[in-house]
Each structure stands twice: as structure tokens, then as C-alpha cells.
Design a protein with these regions (language model features):
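Acidic, low-complexity, intrinsically disordered interaction modules
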Residues: 17-36
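Short helix-capping/linker segments at secondary-structure and domain boundaries
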Residues: 95-104, 349-356
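Intrinsically disordered, low-complexity coil/linker segments enriched for acidic/polar
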Residues: 2, 7, 29, 35, ...
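Charged, long alpha-helical assembly modules
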Residues: 324-426
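Conserved active-site-adjacent core of cysteine acyl-enzyme catalytic domains
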Residues: 60-101, 111-260
């Protein structure tokens, strides 16, 4: 996707600090983060999804609060806007320790790109379609890869959860990642809230007098503030997957790591094997799944294609429409940076090429960008199906045909990329 093609269909974000971010190519073929204020197929999918919920009256009473002022103690970490909350939070935690990794590098080094269509796992009563690894895995993978000691914890007691948070921020003076529900986040637009217990934020300070906390939310354009009561609500959000105050943090890092990970003078001998291992793992995750488990990787895309052809007949028109909406929301809405993280991964391959000197990786960056464009086209055509506009004749079979082509393209891409990186692995 080129910068000039980044959609700006502003709808839900008026008056809010929350904005979309994607990665797009400039005139010279270089990836840049670009702010995007929404995409029509994505917001249409969200509209249809929200119509199925029974909380419209409750959401209508919610107010949008944008508290950005703060007078308490705050760790010195600059705010960075990111496409995906978990990538952005991990990047913030690392940045505090002098490790300057971009969002794409965090995602790529953690082998975050994936695909799964899990008919046996339900969200809102419908199969889960995922374009990345399960939440929490990114932090575990990248800290293990870099030799960083980390910790995570859940709580039965709200008071114990808040005491532990205060101890880390105010006594140990370190930032903390928290997993929260977005439904009651006060700075999210009410009309854009739904019960999703998987948002990541970074807590970097506290005002002892008011009890407010300072927050880096990478989906926001600036730092925000949240009250103690609101933070407790979102940390202990109820639902199908209760959070239990889940939090994670870095305990210590190797002394020489910040120097080795410098962007101006990268330690190529240190970084290159990490990049190659991460890419190899991603390629295997996408192509080496057993035939008896067809739900994941490139095979999973083909599996979704087969299932999609049967939706209208087996589920009826209304249910089939909701299944399709669910796929598009996972593809575009849940902080993917567009096209199910494919643009983010393209940005990773390009940056990895520059930082390791492996020029070939840039060619693969452009190839997966083309695949990302195929996913974007699929999302656009899918919106024509679930909006059912007069005179438009796209069908579920048409969409399934597109998925088959995407499956073939991704399988070929990751097999070729695997062969390429194996030539560099000693």
C-alpha cells in the first residue's frame, strides 16, 4: 500500500486521542508509519457487529473523557503511536531500558505474524480468526530472544493488584504493561467500545494526591491519564476471558544489550542471527503445520476458504453475514496496522534488511506488501457482500476464490523466504 492510498474515513474518532496507524510505502519504496483515521469497510463491519449487541443503551450514556493533564510522578519515556497495542507497549518497556526497537522490529523479532481460523474457539459465538500469535506470546518471545529477565502476574484481589502496580512504579521506578478491557476505557469513543479483554497499555506514573495514573496507550496520539477506579475496572474487566489484573514487566536486561541494539551503529554480528531465527520461525509457523490440523498457517487460509463457501447454506444469510463481519474485524480493526499485520511485517523485513545488511530481505518486504494489498482487496470486496448494496454481485464463492489465491501466495512467499534465510544461517 502506498502512502497516498492510506484511507482517512474518519467516523468514530472525532474528539478522541485514539487513532489508527498503518505502514505504507513512500515514493522511494520505503515503509513509513502513517496515521489513518479509519477505513470504510472496517467501520461498516464494526457497525454491523455493534447492532448485534444488547448494550446500545448503556453505551449511549457513556461520556468521552480525554484526560491528558498530569501532575504526579512520571517516568521519562516518550510516547510513540503504534498500529498494535501489544507491539507498542513492549516497545515502550524496552525503550525505558535504552533498547530502541521500532514496532515492526518488535513484531518481527517475536515472530508475531501468523494465521488461524479456529472453528472450535468462539468469540461472540463465532469462530476466531487470527492474523497473529495469541496475546502475551510476543512479550515472552522477544524477552527470551534478547536474554531479558521478565515477569508477569495475575491476581484474585484488586487491592493486591494495585499495590503491586504501585510498588513497581513508585518504589522500583519501572514501567509496567497491563492488559485491560476497552469497554470502560474513558478515553475511547463510546460508539467504538465493545467487550474486548485484550488491550495493552503501559503505566508510567502516579499522582499520589489524586490517585490518577499516567498511561502510554500506543493507540493514542499522546499520553493519557486514568483514575484509580477506572483502572481497576478495566484491569478486572469481566467477560468470557476475565483478566484478573494481568500485568507484566522487565526485571533486568543484559548490560551490553542497549549498545548492541543501537540503531545508528547496530551490532550486525549480534542482530543478524536473531533476525534470521525469528524469520525462520515465522516461515515454519506458516508452512509446516501437519495436514491433520488444517486450521493454521497458509493451510488455515485455505480452510477458511472452504468453510466460507458453505456459510450461506449451512448458517443462513444473517448468520453468514455476521461470520464474514467477524473475519473483517479481525483482519482490519483489532490493531493490525492493516491487512492482518502483513504491512507491519513488510516494514520489519525492510528494517531488518537495513540493520543486518541482508539486501535480499527488502525484496521480500515488497512481496509481502503485495500480499497485504490482496488482503486489503479481500476486505473491500467482503464489505460489498455484507453491506448488500443494490447492483453489486460479489458472492461468498468470489471471496473464497480470493482466499485460495492468498493462501497460495503466502505459502509460496514463506517457503521462498525460508530458503533465503537458511542460506545465511551458519
Amino acid at each position: 500500500m502506498k502512502k497516498e492510498d492510506v484511507p482517512q474515513d474518519l467516523k468514530y474518532y472525532k474528539g478522541s486521542v485514539i487513532r489508527d496507524l498503518t505502514y505504507a510505502l513512500d515514493d522511494k519504496g520505503h515503509y513509513e508509519p502513517v496515521r489513518s483515521d479509519g477505513w470504510e469497510p472496517k467501520t461498516e463491519a464494526l457497525d454491523i457487529f455493534l447492532e448485534t449487541l444488547d448494550d446500545q443503551e448503556e453505551r449511549d450514556k457513556m461520556e468521552l473523557l480525554v484526560p491528558t493533564e498530569f501532575k504526579g510522578y512520571e517516568l521519562k519515556i516518550n510516547h510513540r503511536h503504534a498500529a498494535h497495542c501489544e507491539n507498542g507497549t513492549i516497545s515502550s518497556l524496552l525503550r525505558f531500558y535504552g533498547i530502541n526497537l521500532s514496532e515492526p522490529m518488535v513484531f518481527g523479532l517475536a515472530s508475531g505474524l501468523f494465521f488461524a481460523h479456529l472453528t472450535f474457539v468462539k468469540m461472540n459465538g463465532m469462530p476466531v480468526t487470527a492474523f497473529r500469535t495469541i496475546p502475551g506470546v510476543l512479550f515472552k518471545r522477544i524477552t527470551r530472544l534478547l536474554g531479558i529477565k521478565s515477569a508477569s502476574q495475575r491476581f484474585l484481589s484488586k487491592e493486591k493488584a494495585m499495590r503491586k502496580l504501585d510498588q513497581l512504579i513508585m518504589e522500583e521506578r519501572i514501567p509496567v504493561g497491563c492488559v485491560v478491557g476497552i469497554y470502560e476505557l474513558p478515553y475511547y469513543p463510546p460508539e467504538n467500545r465493545f467487550r474486548f479483554n485484550g488491550h495493552n497499555i503501559c503505566i508510567i506514573g502516579k499522582d499520589e494526591e489524586s490517585g490518577d495514573y499516567r498511561v502510554l496507550d500506543s493507540n493514542a496520539t499522546e499520553k493519557v491519564t486514568i483514575t484509580r477506579d477506572d483502572l481497576i475496572k478495566v484491569r478486572f474487566a469481566k467477560g468470557a476471558y476475565p483478566l484478573m489484573g494481568q500485568m507484566y514487566w522487565i526485571k533486568s536486561i543484559p548490560e551490553d544489550l542497549p549498545v548492541r541494539m543501537r540503531t545508528d551503529k547496530p551490532d550486525v554480528e549480534f542482530l543478524r542471527p536473531l533476525v534470521l531465527k525469528s524469520i525462520k520461525d515465522t516461515c515454519k509457523n506458516m508452512t509446516s503445520q501437519p495436514k491433520w490440523f488444517p486450521y493454521v498457517g497458509a493451510n488455515g487460509i485455505q480452510y477458511l476458504s472452504r468453510k466460507m463457501r458453505t456459510w450461506e447454506k449451512k448458517l443462513g444469510k444473517r448468520r453468514a453475514r455476521l461470520y464474514l463481519v467477524q473475519v473483517i474485524r479481525m483482519l482490519e480493526e483489532i490493531g493490525t496496522g492493516g491487512a492482518g499485520f502483513r504491512f507491519v511485517y513488510g516494514a520489519f523485513l525492510q528494517e531488518a534488511s537495513e540493520r543486518t545488511g541482508i539486501a535480499e530481505l527488502n525484496d521480500y518486504s515488497l512481496r509481502i506488501t503485495e500480499i497485504g494489498d490482496m488482503w486489503r482487496d479481500f476486505g473491500y470486496k467482503a464489505s460489498k457482500v455484507f453491506k448488500r448494496r443494490a447492483g453489486e454481485s460479489y458472492t461468498y464463492d468470489d471471496l473464497a476464490d480470493m482466499l485460495e489465491k492468498i493462501s497460495d501466495a503466502e505459502r509460496s512467499f514463506f517457503l521462498d523466504l525460508l530458503k533465503a534465510v537458511e542460506r545465511y544461517i551458519k
